Design a protein with these regions (language model features):
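Substrate-binding pocket helix/loop in short-chain dehydrogenase/reductase
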Residues: 94-95, 99-104, 189, 197-200
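Canonical Rossmann dinucleotide-binding motif of NAD(H)/NADP(H)-dependent dehydrogenases/reductases
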Residues: 2-34
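Active-site helix of classical SDR
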Residues: 118, 154, 162
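Short, small/polar-rich loop/turn modules that mediate ligand/substrate recognition or access, typified
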Residues: 170, 175, 230-232
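Residue(s) in the substrate-gating loop at a strand-loop-helix junction
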Residues: 138
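C-terminal substrate-recognition "lid" of short-chain dehydrogenase/reductases
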Residues: 115, 208-237, 242
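Alpha-helical segment proximal to the catalytic Tyr-Lys
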Residues: 123, 167-168, 228
Length: 243
């Protein structure tokens, strides 16, 4: 039997990149998936590609009402047992180049959005008998990131939120773990020049970018019962960059 047969998963930032790869793998393993994103055309196209096992809902992760609608849609399909907090923004700037508006934009999407998502799914996961939440952080949440000050601050916050939520939710049968990707070939990094990406790889012992599928397979492991004794963990998938 497929690992996720009969289960429902909710992915924020699910319209493209890493979220889309996660959705494809989950559907292939029997899950029904709610794709949440602000990218309506891309999200609708992906849902159409995946067929009846996937639905797209416009989800602005900074709005509680959007989360409530997405969770209700997921619960209508069956027991919601998995959430991937994948939505995020990345605008690399030094601290002295970062204004308050840019900092608040990062905290709203990357940090507040994650909090609202976790809070929204807890009641339905409890009704389902438990579940798994995977928060997508970054290696910027494991070490300093001078050139991406606001982004790094929010990814450190996700790391701490994950551990605190794991402590609170373990008695309710809900596991919470964080994934910390290094340089991954996704649309988020398209803002960098090829030269910038090549320079970054000099600090990666494995000498290459990771793929969205490599990260997605780790996410599926954390969503599955194969990781049933893991909570509060922070897993780097970075080619050795944080060694």
């Amino acid at each position: 039997m497929a690992r996720f047969s009969g289960k429902v998963m909710l992915i924020s930032g699910g319209a493209r990149g890493q979220g889309a790869v996660e959705a494809r793998l989950l559907v292939a393993e029997g899950a029904r998936v709610i794709l949440g994103d602000v990218l309506e055309a891309e999200g609708a196209a992906l849902a159409s590609e995946l067929g009846p096992a996937a639905q797209f809902f416009k989800l602005d992760v900074t709005k509680e009402a959007d989360w409530a609608r997405a969770v209700a849609a997921a619960e209508a399909l069956g027991p919601l047992t998995g959430l991937v907090n994948n939505a995020g923004i990345y605008v690399p700037k030094l601290m002295m180049e970062t204004d308050a508006a840019l900092f608040e934009r990062h905290t709203s999407v990357n940090q507040l959005g994650c909090f609202l998502g976790m809070k929204a799914v807890v009641p339905t996961m409890e009704r389902a008998g438990g579940g798994s939440i995977v928060n997508i952080s970054s290696t910027a949440g494991l070490r300093g990131s001078a050139r991406a000050f606001a982004y790094g601050a929010t990814k450190w916050a996700l790391r701490g939120m994950t551990k605190s939520a794991a402590l609170e939710l373990a008695p309710r049968g809900i596991r919470v773990n964080s994934v910390h990707p290094g340089p991954i070939a996704t649309p988020m990094l398209d803002i960098r020049t090829p030269e910038e990406n090549a320079a970054r790889l000099t600090s990666v012992p494995m000498g290459r970018q990771g793929t969205a599928e490599e990260v997605a397979r780790l996410v599926l492991f954390l969503l599955s019962d194969e990781s049933s004794y893991m909570t509060g963990s922070e897993l780097a998938i970075d080619g050795g960059a944080t060694l």
